[in-house]
């Protein structure tokens, strides 16, 4: 009965957060063979294995699945669905699981040759030095791992500066076997490197400069250095690039974090408390175990300043520093890359995913594209989340998964080894288009043929939940009705995320929340009769009033499928106190209608015929964003809150709407 393909849903066993335990589609499963010798695996949607099944005990009404590790699944049949719990070492792991049979199989996960040109082959034997110290200009010693090709060279150098304490043997062998010297360097305060981790911006910039120039002088190096790095490592690559070291020949970061007031730890100066997981992970010289942290329950309590202590992480200086700067002040401006990006002289390849929870690559592309005379820049935006476009399950089609290192290798073959492989003459933008599930090359970002289309919010005053009368249309509203709801910080509208994951997942199903939460207004279009492609930056403009001194306005864009399930496309937030600018705070006047402009990030998606476009408006998405306590005080340090009574206006004088970048088809 298990043979075939399954969707896998998870839910946490218990939580103090209302709605936080909602079922989430987290992965897929495939089984083959008779029950007596069945094989298969359960994988996350990113493609990572959760359980490789090696043993099955099948009874008439239940199944036990186990593998080589410590995980076991006990499940009972409910019709054609399996429902049960996960066990770790025979004990409940606090997570429930459902397997729902798919009607169509997943596509086999083979990397797609997005850039089909030739790349350097794996041909060299490899030697490793697991601990080499580099001395910075101020005398600090930074621990480095070096993998070298066996040969005389000269070789290009691939440098990865990292705050993560791991020896990158796999990466080292990949690059060195292909004719590159690979260097992974621990930043200050990590592993056995001197100093304090996450120090000031200037130190990271200087260390990046020094590391590039040191790497360029390594034996058998050709003097050309390229930098890679994922997530925070990508930030470090950008920090080095803005210092313009003479021997930095190219960078190719993936999912690089952006300016910190824009994303991580704040999003447009709204704090994201789920980053406590990362702060606890990084609180010491080595990566800390956070697998047992009950972050969901801890988040239910106030104030946020005490969150690391409630989790048993102790004092976390990085967390304290984040909390200490709640406005766009000189601290955050100093850490920004976009304002210094004209200093970057090296060619840039950026790789990320539409569901990455970092907007850095798009922000950097926009800023760098405005610099006259900058060397070549390429942007690759795929279907993945923060872990990368390498880890995408097959549900987006045969072209969905791309090998990041192969793109970086072709980039460095050109700029570090001088091979005329044509990568600098190709169209500079690659986007994966959801719906069509194809990659497409473009001449520029944003797309020149974009037509901004306004979709207006309207109702008869009862838009609460998806059963209400909220309408989304390209025709401006003619009526004068407004919609109201109450926002209670004790029961915030939830965002579907397991906070033990360090990222948002791919396309969350918000169907149940749209139907049940009366503190969210829902506006849905008519059935689409033709495809509508939306590729680019999205935004919203709301006219709204509150009786609170401060509050939040959140807009989410969703794709409603013919079967009724609603998948999140993107969302964005405006904190009322920052409506005049992120560097100043202005409390509200009770009942005054104000305009809020909200950044909805970006996507590339075809809303297909038979689908509907949906917009929801709420005042919380917790714990993605911290709860606004509605008092006008400090939302991170305070514990008292009030209920806010909200009014969204959508009349001819106040035409609340979203703007979608439509691509003619």
Model feature map: region roles:
Residues 229-239:
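Glycine-rich nucleophile elbow surrounding the catalytic serine of serine-hydrolase chemistry
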Residues 219-231:
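Alpha/beta-hydrolase fold nucleophile elbow
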Residues 108-151, 524, 528-530:
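N-terminal cap/lid segment of alpha/beta-hydrolase-fold proteins
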Residues 2-78, 85-86, 93:
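Central antiparallel beta-sheet cores of small beta-barrel/beta-sandwich binding domains
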Residues 344, 350-352:
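Short beta-strand/loop motif that positions the catalytic acidic residue
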Residues 177, 239-343:
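Accessory cap/linker subdomain of secreted extracellular hydrolases
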Residues 133, 404, 417-665:
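Glycine/threonine-rich phosphate-binding loop and adjacent beta-strand/alpha-helix elements that clamp
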Residues 117, 149-216, 391-396, 515-517, ...:
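Cap/lid segment of the alpha/beta-hydrolase catalytic domain
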């Amino acid at each position: 009965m298990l043979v075939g393909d399954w969707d896998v849903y998870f839910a946490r066993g218990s939580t103090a957060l209302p709605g936080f335990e909602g079922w989430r589609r987290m992965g897929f499963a495939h089984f083959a063979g008779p029950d007596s010798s069945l094989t298969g695996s359960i994988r996350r949607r990113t493609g990572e294995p959760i359980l490789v099944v090696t043993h099955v005990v099948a009874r008439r009404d239940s199944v036990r699945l186990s593998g080589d590790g410590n995980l076991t699944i006990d499940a009972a049949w409910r019709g054609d669905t399996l429902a049960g719990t996960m066990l770790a070492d025979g004990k409940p792991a606090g997570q429930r699981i459902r397997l729902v049979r798919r009607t169509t199989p997943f596509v086999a996960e083979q990397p797609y040759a997005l850039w089909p040109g030739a790349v350097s082959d794996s041909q060299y034997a490899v030697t490793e030095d697991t601990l080499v110290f580099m001395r910075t200009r101020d005398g600090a010693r930074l621990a480095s791992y070096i993998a070298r090709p066996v040969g005389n060279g000269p070789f290009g150098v691939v440098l990865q500066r990292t705050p993560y304490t791991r020896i990158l043997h796999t990466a080292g062998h990949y690059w060195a076997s292909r004719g590159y010297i690979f260097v992974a360097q621990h930043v200050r305060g990590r592993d056995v490197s001197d100093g304090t981790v996450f120090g000031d911006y200037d130190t990271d910039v200087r260390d990046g400069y020094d590391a590039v120039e040191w790497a360029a002088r390594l034996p058998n190096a050709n003097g050309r250095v390229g930098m890679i790095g994922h997530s925070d490592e990508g930030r470090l690559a950008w920090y080095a690039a803005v210092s313009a070291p003479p021997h930095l020949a190219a960078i190719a970061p993936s999912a690089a974090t952006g300016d910190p007031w824009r994303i991580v730890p704040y999003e447009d100066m709204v704090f994201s408390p789920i980053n406590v997981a990362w702060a606890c992970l990084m609180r010491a010289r080595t990566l800390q175990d956070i697998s047992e942290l009950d972050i969901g329950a801890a988040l239910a309590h106030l104030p946020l300043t005490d969150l690391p202590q409630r989790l048993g992480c102790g004092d976390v200086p990085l967390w304290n520093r984040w909390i200490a700067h709640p406005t766009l002040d000189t601290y955050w401006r100093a850490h920004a890359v976009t304002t210094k990006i004209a200093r970057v002289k090296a060619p840039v390849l950026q790789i990320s995913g539409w569901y990455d929870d970092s907007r850095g690559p798009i922000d950097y592309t926009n800023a760098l594209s405005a610099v006259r005379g900058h060397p070549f820049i390429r942007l690759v935006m795929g279907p993945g989340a923060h872990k990368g476009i390498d880890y995408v399950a097959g549900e987006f089609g045969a072209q969905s998964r791309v090998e990041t290192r192969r793109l970086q290798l072709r980039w460095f073959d050109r700029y570090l080894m001088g091979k005329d492989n044509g990568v600098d003459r190709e169209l500079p933008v690659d986007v994966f288009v959801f719906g069509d599930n194809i990659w497409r090359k473009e001449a520029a970002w944003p797309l020149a043929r974009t037509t901004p289309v306004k979709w207006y919010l309207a109702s008869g005053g009862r838009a609460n939940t998806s059963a209400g009368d909220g309408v989304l249309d390209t025709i401006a509203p003619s009526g004068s009705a407004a919609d109201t709801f109450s926002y209670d910080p004790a029961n915030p509208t939830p965002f579907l995320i397991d906070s033990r994951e360090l990222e948002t997942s791919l396309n969350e199903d918000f169907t149940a929340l749209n139907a049940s939460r009366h503190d969210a207004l829902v506006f849905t279009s008519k059935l689409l009769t033709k495809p509508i492609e939306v590729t680019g930056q999205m935004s919203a403009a709301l006219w709204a009033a509150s009786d609170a001194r401060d509050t939040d306005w959140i807009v989410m864009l969703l794709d409603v499928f013919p079967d009724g399930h609603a998948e999140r496309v993107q969302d964005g937030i405006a904190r009322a106190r920052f409506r005049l600018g992120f560097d100043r705070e202005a409390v509200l006047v009770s009942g005054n209608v104000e305009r809020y402009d909200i950044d909805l990030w970006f996507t590339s998606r075809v809303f297909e015929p038979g689908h509907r476009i949906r917009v929801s408006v709420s005042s919380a998405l917790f714990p993605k964003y911290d709860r606004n306590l509605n008092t006008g005080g400090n939302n991170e340090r305070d514990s008292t809150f009030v209920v806010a009574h909200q009014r969204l206006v959508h009349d001819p004088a106040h035409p609340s709407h979203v703007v979608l970048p439509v691509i003619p088809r």
